[in-house]
């Protein structure tokens, strides 16, 4: 296999595109973006390049900036709102809509205008959304960090339109959806997108008649509100009387954004007290009643909150739908970057230079950091500076932003005041400030104007309040305030203690390290960042302050369980001394056998669930300073090895980006105590292997054991592995099994093994697919180096004869998938399964028939189509593609889509080298000719480790759906069902007819199934078990409908059981419906018919003639003596049998004693290859009688039934006697 990328990046691309371009006009697909980039520009623009970080290579390839990309069209939406009919004031009063509310809105909340404000993320693209499995109570809402046992999977990826889909367990549509995630990850923007999409008629219109959006930080400014006033404030213009709105509460959706921000306690009122909807009550009581279902129990709610705040939010949330926002995929980070600089900016920036800085690219997983990065670049361009970003942390990036935006040191005093305001707001859980708040704090008018101009502060649209540009920015300023205050304290220890007490009081000890303010504070206590603060504030900080404050904050955690929050804090700090001291000082014993959050640094294995690239980066960074000796990144289906304790196993349900791999491997350059690394089951691209081997060559890397089982490695990767073996003297064990290395790859490894600097003692790799020459070379290496042990199950290697340019026969090796069940052989399929390309047919090989695994080697760039399966690949270069036939029942029953979507085609597990396939056409059996099916209902389902995601195809053709630049995993076509349509979906179907002769009687089996190659293959194999042979007849011409029933009839008196067939879809692993037809004498032939039971119209008929019947062992009449001698079946197909028989030894065992003597048996077995054995066998068969050849034929039929059946069908007749 070339660099397999099964399951990698697929969710990212699905999470990038999906069908959301229909939801938000700002969403752009990758295809549309590339089209925009290709448009001619009116004038050349200057090009600026970034200075990359030391130690990271950068590329010189220039990527043109995309042209103007549409942003949110606020003006058009305002025009729509203005065109709406406005109700008369008297009409409002008479119908109970309380029009005075709209007159008071400027005094209460400014939601209408804020929805039209230019937010930081106006250019927002799509977010990765993970639907989580919700536990039974709210006390477990927060994800546990450490697990003493294997954690369950964390859910599956979804899109914005799936937020209110039925729960997996209950299959009920949720009334409460919680949008959770880290700070700045995009929760509020997602909530606004839902509201905007509903306003524009693109989302949830069939479920909700009214959707109300509320910013909780703005709601908190209101002391009291009635339900009617709340509803009025949630509407931009009154759309209906309040009584009418409340008459159908099940059609209402309340979106409460930032429910965790205000300092309120949401307590439900006494349910026995029925408060009228017009009666005012405290806001927190009103919201608590909504959440507690005391009022409007049928209404739906959507809440957004930081994950750490969920546990203390409300006493009980029932069974919510939990969706975690994971930020940007790697593609969306690039897309956001282009969109930011697309409008009104006359400079093109090469994103590849940013992409070449993996740490920075990983930080940009958080959308707020993306905005921060782009703002810094914009400020540098405006100031005429050379673009240079070397920030390793979010804290460093914030300081860079501050140094670029603050016009001079004359504002340092006012900047201190702003920091104090931020800290006061954080302590009081306030994010909105009045003009008097700013003045009381000491901010001057001109300073406020300056902070507004540079974007640190923003004025709310009502002009009555101010806020920081983002809550994370306020938390950063608050962190600076604590350092400024501590440096001014006369008694430093008291100041430090007071700071820690304030933080603990605000966030709680358990969540202290999860708080962004604390993370920023640790980041600012880095030596380099403190110097930067000194430059900004024009002052000097006593270094004792730094040390004492660090001790005050980090001094407590040794009594606390270690978790992701602490890792984030340590990463932000970056101080090696602090990292080493902290990570090595944790206790090595658990506090108790039931301690669910026992630290990882124990003498056993602990497990940690990580969801994002950022989490993977900070964890791997920190553990290199710890006691951990073994690290496993859990992949799919990998074999478990016993790890050396203390060990850590990382679980991740979402794809790992290329940037994340680079960061992970960069952290291995100095591993300290880490000696074992297991990446088995994780697909590694060509560039990822290069990064890994580069890290392993570093002198500071102490890895001794590396497991890379089933990582999709190819011969291209072996040059890096060989170079690493030559340079890395510590690596002692390397496992490369279940990878497609081939002869060339193993030869390169041998070169590395011969190097005197190589100390490898154990090498595990598959040898079944290797040629004799390479196996001999491996044995010679073992003989020459007694310390080297090459471990493998030494099985007979399988080769296929090919013809070289000289016409001589040569051997071509192919991958052997080694399983515990034993040797799996490989054989070519018939020509029906060939791929047809630019140079003609390309044969498909059987890798493992039991596992339905096949392989095709496409020799050059071009388009290749397989008529049998319907698959179509467009490739840019020579590539090897593995194709597995799967059953939907393995995957679909675990998702709610089985009720909302219909299977529309076969399911394939495809693996191919990353970037080699530019398009794949996946077959479907939905008939588009009828004009009854909208192509927008088609989706491609990807089943990955983290769950299932849906991707919208680039286009849908009559027989296939097209994916461009695909990523691969088990994938197939689904059709979204419309309730009104039900089963009235026209499909393309086929009829399959099988027969078996018994004396004079004939038995037929007739199937009517969707045109799905996996179903056809499953039926073929089932019928073959009972020696039934298929007859090829044309399928029904017209489209049929699932669930329809058809009457089976014949032109002769025959026995038919059952006489009706239903057209339905059943998974290939399930039994298929068929009718059995018994015919005593076929005579000149019979006519079979299928008639629609409801309308009694003929939909299919076929004529079966005696010439259609070719039994497996037909009776042949003796030929006249003067007629030319007939060739026996084995002689007719000698060439095919020599080339395609792959298990010769079992064949010889059946012939031993009947046809072969002991000497003949041993002589044939002594040959080196299967082809040589078959040639030797045929040379001896020249003296065999016809009966001996019959025995030979029977042995072939028993050992290679599929091969014999294929030859029989193609030959049209045989010469075999009974």
Swiss-Prot record:
Residue numbers spanned by region UPA: 969-1118
Domain called FIIND: residue spans: 835-1118
Site feature: Trigger for autolytic processing: 942
Keywords: ATP-binding, Cytoplasm, Hydrolase, Immunity, Inflammasome, Inflammatory response, Innate immunity, Leucine-rich repeat, Necrosis, Nucleotide-binding, Nucleus, Protease, Repeat, Ubl conjugation
UniProt xrefs under CDD domains: CARD_ASC_NALP1 (cd08330)
Record-linked PROSITE patterns: CARD, FIIND, NACHT
A GO BP annotation: signal transduction
Activity regulation as described: Activated by cleavage by B.anthracis lethal toxin (LT) endopeptidase. Cleavage by LT promotes ubiquitination and degradation of the N-terminal part, releasing the cleaved C-terminal part of the protein (NACHT, LRR and PYD domains-containing protein 1a, C-terminus), which polymerizes and forms the Nlrp1a inflammasome. Nlrp1a inflammasome is inhibited by DPP8 and DPP9, which sequester the C-terminal fragment of Nlrp1a (NACHT, LRR and PYD domains-containing protein 1a, C-terminus) in a ternary complex, thereby preventing Nlrp1a oligomerization and activation.
Positions annotated as LRR repeat: 343-364, 673-693, 730-750
Domain NACHT: 175-484
Compartment annotation: Cytoplasm, Cytosol; Cytoplasm; Nucleus
Pfam families: CARD (PF00619), FIIND (PF13553), LRR_6 (PF13516), NACHT (PF05729), NLRC4_HD2 (PF17776), NOD2_WH (PF17779), UPA-FIIND (PF23679)
One Gene Ontology term of the molecular function aspect: enzyme binding
Quaternary structure annotation from Swiss-Prot or TrEMBL: Interacts (via LRR repeats) with BCL2 and BCL2L1 (via the loop between motifs BH4 and BH3). Interacts with NOD2; this interaction is enhanced in the presence of muramyl dipeptide (MDP) and increases IL1B release. Interacts with EIF2AK2/PKR; this interaction requires EIF2AK2 activity, is accompanied by EIF2AK2 autophosphorylation and promotes inflammasome assembly in response to danger-associated signals. Interacts with MEFV; this interaction targets Nlrp1a to degradation by autophagy, hence preventing excessive IL1B- and IL18-mediated inflammation.
Role this protein plays: Acts as the sensor component of the Nlrp1a inflammasome, which mediates inflammasome activation in response to various pathogen-associated signals, leading to subsequent pyroptosis. Inflammasomes are supramolecular complexes that assemble in the cytosol in response to pathogens and other damage-associated signals and play critical roles in innate immunity and inflammation.
Free-text domain note: The leucine-rich repeat (LRR) domain may be involved in autoinhibition in the absence of activating signal, possibly through intramolecular interaction with the NACHT domain. The FIIND (domain with function to find) region is involved in homomerization, but not in CASP1-binding. Autocatalytic cleavage in this region occurs constitutively, prior to activation signals, and is required for inflammasome activity (IL1B release), possibly by facilitating CASP1 binding. Both N- and C-terminal fragments remain associated.
Protein name: NACHT, LRR and PYD domains-containing protein 1a allele 1
